[in-house]
Amino acid sequence: MLCVGRLGGLGARAAALPPRRAGRGILEAGIRARRVSTSWSPVGAAFNVKPQGSRLDLFGERRGLFGVPELSAPEGFHAAQEKALRKAELLVGRACSTPPGPQTVLIFDELSDSLCRVADLADFVKIAHPEPAFREAAEEACRSIGTMVEKLNTNVDLYQSLRKLLADKKLVDSLDPETRRVAELFMFDFEISGIHLDKEKRKRAVDLNVKILDLSSTFLMGANFPNKIEKHLLPEHIRRNFTSAGDHIIIDGLHAESPDDLVREAAYKIFLYPNAGQLKCLEELLSSRDLLAKLVGYSTFSHRALQGTIAKNPETVMQFLEKLSDKLSERTLKDFEMIRGMKMKLNPQNSEVMPWDPPYYSGVIRAERYNIEPSLYCPFFSLGACMEGLNILLNRLLGISLYAEQPAKGEVWSEDVRKLAVVHESEGLLGYIYCDFFQRADKPHQDCHFTIRGGRLKEDGDYQLPVVVLMLNLPRSSRSSPTLLTPGMMENLFHEMGHAMHSMLGRTRYQHVTGTRCPTDFAEVPSILMEYFANDYRVVNQFARHYQTGQPLPKNMVSRLCESKKVCAAADMQLQVFYATLDQIYHGKHPLRNSTTDILKETQEKFYGLPYVPDTAWQLRFSHLVGYGAKYYSYLMSRAVASMVWKECFLQDPFNRAAGERYRREMLAHGGGREPMLMVEGMLQKCPSVDDFVSALVSDLDLDFETFLMDSE
């Protein structure tokens, strides 16, 4: 029943409606277009100046976080959750007493919305607010709402009210496709909790769900926990690369970018050394997921997890991964040969390529072959220029403008958070984006998109505007310069804005399927598509200007940057295929035919090609097994779809308004309210096959010979 509001970095970065003109149906249902506000200012300037104290309205009335009156103090979370729980009780009563029909689905959605509005907001505040009191209060609210959701998902009367609707064929046939899909999604949530089982099995399902939550939390903590080794066991000259603690050296990561081969090797072997407790936790997590899936009627956890996705089932996922691996194998071998050549050049004594080598040596090759030192690019990518670039692109593609709006006192959690109003040229205000872009103490390091409030059509005909947060970790401005982004930071900004536009334009009738609340292998398509725009010179040329001289970024610098990303890209993609395959096997048929480490060894040798290192257990650090269990392939599949959309719709003209409107209408407007493959078909005007997806990914690896011609001129 509860939506998860966060979309973070998956993969290399580490979230049915009848066809209609996007946004029109809802507007015609009675929404009044909002006029442009006089308090809005141009977006570029807002990000290249430091916020003044006055912009936070120091003497005005305190509004509360995100304008929620109760949240002007940490204690307000208790009031907000109590209010939501009271409303939930009333709505449960209404749902159980209302005759089955479309109204049943509306009540369920309002129930979901009343809980999500507190839970999603709290989910963000508990990790992002600088004040511990706010974080703790938000954590408690998450727990309280989570308990309520567990109760609702096992409420037999509530389940029966929905089952009566879906069991009546005549009633179901009378529902519009979006309403029917939302009803089925709510039913899916119920059945995952085992509500359709007898009392004893239902209790077992609830117990397994609780156990899985606890094991997931324990596994995540263990995945990031450092390992230590006695000092005398490490060569003296590499000890200074690690943290000391008495007689021990602490290893807290892989040190993948270290130029010293021995440092990388030591970090790899020590950080990935098996921990018996973590191993037991993973085994229990996988077997508990399998037991739960079987209990509620699925042959494997993977079959359960892939319901409603583009792939639909594990067989399709494995076909996709195996075909992709076959197509990559020759290119991957060439990449490893290139890495071996560079390693031999720098370290003639030991040129064998090991798993700790590719990230470092591919970076060396990139730097040698293309002059792409980030400091050459940063002056052209001031944050204000990049935001203006996004504004230009969104305006030309979708008729959307971003305006900076002054937040009220207490509305934001840090004075450097900017608030953007998202405004359509004819439809008016679509929603708000809060930009939490800058580094600060205790802030999570991952770039993320959070849904704070989902959009939905309210009973009075007005539309509940979506509210999201984009969280990045950019350096602050200095006395002499505004915030300057590396090319990677600029691409991440475009990526996260892709999620935000999905939230703004996925204007569904129901909150349960609004914006990014869609299957995982579709959710990354809008964000990855934005990366293609960020790497196109015609787009970059609109905004990349030197912050001091105003000079545009030369075309050959953009081309070199794009081509440099293809260095060892096949090996990088092959690594993702290995991870995704391992994830599928772990969540496939149980009992597993071997230990998780033996399966890792087999899979690494078959799907990656570099040797397994004895006495290591990389799977115990694979934290994505928790959030993306059986769905790690999603990033690759989303990239394949985004690549096809780019090539077929935007490659000829990245500012094509007709293609932009079609993209909104076919892919963004439905949120999760339509089957993802139907949205892909609508956009591409064909039903892509697994071979099409594989070809799209592989063709992206081909070098663009225009770059070499330009550089040789």
UniProtKB/Swiss-Prot annotation:
One of its GO terms (cellular component) is mitochondrial matrix. Zn(2+) binds at residues 495, 499, 502. The keyword Nucleus does not apply. SUPFAM superfamilies: Metalloproteases ('zincins'), catalytic domain. Activity is divalent cation-dependent. It is stimulated by manganese, magnesium or calcium ions and reversibly inhibited by zinc, cobalt and iron. InterPro entries: M3A_MIP, MetalloPept_cat_dom_sf, Neurolysin/TOP_dom2, Pept_M3A_M3B, Pept_M3A_M3B_dom. Pfam families: Peptidase_M3. Gene3D superfamilies: 1.10.1370.40, Collagenase (Catalytic Domain) (3.40.390.10), Neurolysin, domain 3 (1.10.1370.10). The modification N6-acetyllysine is found at residue 126. It catalyses: Release of an N-terminal octapeptide as second stage of processing of some proteins imported into the mitochondrion. GO terms for molecular function: metal ion binding; metalloendopeptidase activity. Its EC number is 3.4.24.59. Binds 1 zinc ion. One of its GO terms (biological process) is peptide metabolic process. Keywords: Acetylation, Calcium, Cobalt, Hydrolase, Iron, Magnesium, Manganese, Metal-binding, Metalloprotease, Mitochondrion, Protease, Transit peptide, Zinc. It is found in: Mitochondrion matrix. The keyword Iron applies. Monomer. This is Mitochondrial intermediate peptidase.
